[in-house]
């Protein structure tokens, strides 16, 4: 049976997506290994996967990019964000290749899967080592298509003359701003004897043998004019209960006679807890039960102030246990959180903070399954108004339930595993 090597950073959402796909591949009888940060070794051992740790890649440097307060992680400062993006995507490619080359030689995977941001596999190794590569997009398809605006600014989809003109203008500006990224990527490719890029990195990623989008077209502007290599598999993020996390039995003590609202900033949020504070203050003493989670931060360290009786604050709770009980979820817009909520028909309020979260929020709002609340408007009063609007407007839940039905038809991890298996078998046939 084919062997699959999955690469991923140690960020929680990346790990959850990868483990879901790895489990589905293993259920089909395949061997699966992961390449990730050394600190994830125990997690993969617990799951029973072969594990190869980063050797040359500096995980601490990546943590600085993700979590250091002096880094720009949104497009508010375009030039600084471009520099951050170049560091994140490109500067570790030589170390990735140095780590992965001996694994390819010794473990001999049939397919190499990158997590969409470990880009060495599709920018270098696919052509250099003649191994089929699949790349992942966790929510938004990054391959440019006619039905979507340029990625990054959360623009409206180009459906009339005004939005089409806006999309074309921004696309031209984006090519200029990101020219340094393309030049750096071409320099790296030339150092491995490969030709320079003639397109953007995102467009080039659509040329790999398989570009998997872990979402559905219906939640991605119904894109149809994409390369044949792009396939939508549905969400693959519903595993999220490591054995070392505490039980959620305490949820049984929370009254069920009022709506349940959950607010989370995810596990990668390091800035001021604007969402949790607005929820704790704005929803206090209202006829609802509000469950706040701090991710990797203890609520007691977040300066949320005195908590009302209806506010329940904990560090973490498994979404497998919590989400089916919710009436509304408030989030900063991480891909796994958003898809997990919609998979069980829960409408959303998204306060998009950084990276791809504004793009995700725009897509959810377009679908009618939730609304956006800009971070600068995330006050207790506006949070209360947003929650009451979603609770008392049936269309939000109806659209969330509609999307849940669409998700169920795509298969998620099982579909992703099947497509990866087909890629491996096709490559084996070509070789033979």
PLM region descriptions:
Residues 215-328:
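Donor-nucleotide binding loops and adjacent catalytic segments primarily
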Residues 67-121, 164, 168-202, 206-207:
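Conserved nucleotide-sugar donor-binding subdomain of glycosyltransferases
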Residues 107, 380-432:
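C-terminal amphipathic helix plus adjacent low-complexity
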């Amino acid at each position: 049976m084919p062997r699959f090597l999955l690469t991923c950073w140690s960020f929680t959402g990346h790990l959850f997506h990868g483990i879901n796909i790895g489990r589905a591949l293993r259920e089909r009888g395949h061997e699966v290994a992961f390449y990730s940060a050394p600190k994830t070794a125990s997690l993969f051992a617990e799951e029973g996967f072969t594990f190869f740790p980063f050797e040359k890649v500096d995980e601490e440097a990546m943590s600085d990019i993700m979590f250091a307060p002096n880094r720009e992680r949104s497009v508010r400062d375009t030039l600084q964000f471009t520099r951050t993006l170049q560091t994140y995507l490109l500067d570790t490619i030589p170390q990735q290749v140095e780590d992965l080359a001996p694994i390819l030689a010794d473990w001999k995977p049939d397919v190499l899967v990158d997590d969409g941001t470990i880009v060495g596999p599709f920018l270098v190794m696919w052509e250099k080592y003649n191994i089929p590569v699949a790349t992942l997009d966790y929510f938004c398809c990054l391959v440019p298509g006619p039905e979507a605006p340029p990625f990054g600014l959360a623009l409206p989809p180009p459906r009339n003359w005004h939005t089409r003109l806006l999309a074309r203008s921004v696309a031209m500006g984006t090519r200029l701003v990101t020219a340094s990224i393309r030049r750096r990527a071409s320099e790296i490719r030339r150092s491995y004897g490969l030709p320079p890029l003639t397109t953007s990195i995102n467009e080039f990623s659509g040329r790999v043998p398989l570009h998997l989008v872990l979402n559905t077209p219906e939640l991605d502007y119904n894109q149809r004019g994409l390369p044949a290599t792009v396939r939508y598999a549905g969400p693959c993020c519903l595993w999220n209960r490591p054995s070392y996390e505490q039980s959620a039995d305490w949820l049984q003590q929370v009254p069920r006679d009022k709506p349940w609202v959950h607010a989370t900033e995810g596990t990668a949020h390091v800035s001021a807890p604007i969402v949790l504070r607005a929820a704790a203050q704005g929803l206090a003493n209202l006829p609802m039960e509000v469950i706040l989670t701090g991710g990797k931060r203890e609520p007691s360290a977040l300066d949320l102030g005195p908590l009302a009786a209806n506010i329940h604050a904990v560090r973490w709770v498994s979404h497998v246990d919590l989400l089916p009980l919710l009436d509304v979820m408030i989030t900063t817009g991480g891909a796994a959180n958003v898809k997990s909520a919609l998979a069980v028909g829960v409408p959303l309020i998204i306060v998009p903070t950084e990276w791809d979260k504004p793009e995700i929020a725009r897509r959810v709002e377009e679908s009618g399954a939730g609304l956006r609340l800009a971070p600068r408007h995330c006050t207790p009063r506006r949070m209360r108004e947003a929650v009451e609007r979603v609770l008392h407007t049936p269309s939000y839940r109806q659209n969330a339930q509609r999307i849940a039905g669409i998700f169920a038809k795509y298969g998620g991890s099982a579909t992703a595993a099947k497509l990866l298996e087909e890629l491996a078998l096709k490559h084996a046939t070509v070789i033979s």
